[in-house]
């Protein structure tokens, strides 16, 4: 079994940059690295992503949202993640099931026990070996997004500040409940400093796998 690393955190925390840097470094070390994101990562998942994040879908119910996220996740796990991990590779994923607990659980206030049951069904019990939470104040993260070049904000990014604050608190609560799996990092640090800490932790996880 390979190593499964997920990145979590509020919007604008720099996850995508850190995913790219980590994957490139691991590849240079000789590891077979797969990078992916949620929702998406498969043809079906990417189609679901378009529906989920379309700003025009303002009428989407929280229950619809969680089932769509879980459908995309089930496809990603079965089609992409499990085969790569079974072959001994490293998966670096930009968001995974913990985002469901933070955004749909804490953010939308859906029942966490129901979300856990749906998630277990969708993932077959697959859990990351290491989850890196890039944390920063919500206003700062959204400010980064606004000042970036990523184009129009998606449906989730357009939610009220209070929603994003609840989601952030959710990430921190999840991390506190599983300190062995989670590492919370200050995402206001320089990119290079963050990456150095991430690499040290990932190397330790790889050593434990051997």
Please report, for each region that a protein language model flagged, where it lies by residue.
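Hydrophobic anchor at the beta1->P-loop junction of P-loop NTPases
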Residues: 7
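A glycine- and Lys/Arg-enriched "phosphate-lid" helix/loop adjacent to the NTP-binding pocket
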Residues: 100-169
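Conserved lysine of the Walker
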Residues: 15
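Pre-Walker A (Motif I) flank of P-loop NTPase domains
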Residues: 1-4
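Hydrophobic positions on the alpha1 helix immediately C-terminal to the Walker A/P-loop
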Residues: 18
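Walker A (P-loop) phosphate-binding loop of P-loop NTPases
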Residues: 12
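NTP-dependent small-molecule kinase module
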Residues: 23, 139-210
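ATP-dependent small-molecule kinase phosphotransfer cores
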Residues: 31-123, 197
């Amino acid at each position: 079994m390979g190593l499964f690393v997920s990145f979590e955190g509020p919007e604008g925390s720099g996850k995508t940059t850190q995913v790219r840097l980590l994957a490139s470094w691991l590849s240079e070390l000789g590891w077979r690295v797969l990078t992916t994101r949620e929702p998406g990562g498969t043809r079906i998942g990417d189609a679901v992503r378009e529906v989920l994040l379309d700003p025009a879908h303002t009428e989407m119910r929280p229950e619809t949202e969680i089932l769509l996220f879980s459908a995309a996740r089930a496809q990603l796990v079965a089609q992409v993640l499990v085969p790569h991990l079974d072959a001994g590779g490293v998966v670096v994923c930009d968001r995974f099931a913990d985002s469901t607990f933070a955004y749909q659980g804490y953010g939308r206030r859906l029942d966490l026990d129901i979300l856990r049951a749906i998630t277990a069904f969708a993932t077959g019990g697959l859990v990351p070996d290491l989850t890196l939470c890039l944390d920063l104040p919500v206003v700062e993260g959204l400010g980064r997004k606004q000042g970036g070049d990523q184009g129009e904000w998606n449906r989730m990014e357009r939610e009220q500040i209070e929603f994003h604050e609840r989601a952030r608190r959710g990430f921190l609560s999840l991390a506190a409940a599983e300190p062995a799996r989670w590492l919370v990092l200050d995402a206001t640090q320089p990119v290079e400093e963050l990456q150095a800490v991430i690499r040290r932790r990932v190397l330790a996880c790889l050593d434990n796998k051997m």
